[in-house]
Swiss-Prot record:
Zn(2+) binds at residues 24, 27, 40, 43. NCBIfam families: PRK08061.1 (NF005974). InterPro entries: Ribosomal_uS14, Ribosomal_uS14_bact, Ribosomal_uS14_CS, Ribosomal_uS14_sf. Binds 16S rRNA, required for the assembly of 30S particles and may also be responsible for determining the conformation of the 16S rRNA at the A site. It comes from Campylobacter jejuni subsp. jejuni serotype O:2 (strain ATCC 700819 / NCTC 11168). This is Small ribosomal subunit protein uS14. The lineage of its organism: Bacteria, Pseudomonadati, Campylobacterota, Epsilonproteobacteria, Campylobacterales.
Length: 61
């Protein structure tokens, strides 16, 4: 889990737009965030397996 201070810091608008970065909306993780869903790979996998994301299903080939 991310610190509350880091989540608050990320929520502020940066002075320069290139400094902005995505953070998971659920757990606050800063890396591997899928922009389409706004959540990280860990939360995406967990919610996908539980069937909470419509249209998302596990690949099998």
């Amino acid at each position: 889990m991310a610190k509350k201070s880091m989540i608050a810091k990320a929520a502020r608008k940066p002075k320069f737009k290139v400094r902005a970065y995505t953070r998971c909306q659920i757990c606050g993780r800063p890396h591997s965030v899928y922009r389409d869903f706004g959540i990280c790979r860990v939360c995406l996998r967990k919610m996908g397996n539980e069937g909470l994301i419509p249209g998302l299903k596990k690949a099998s080939w």
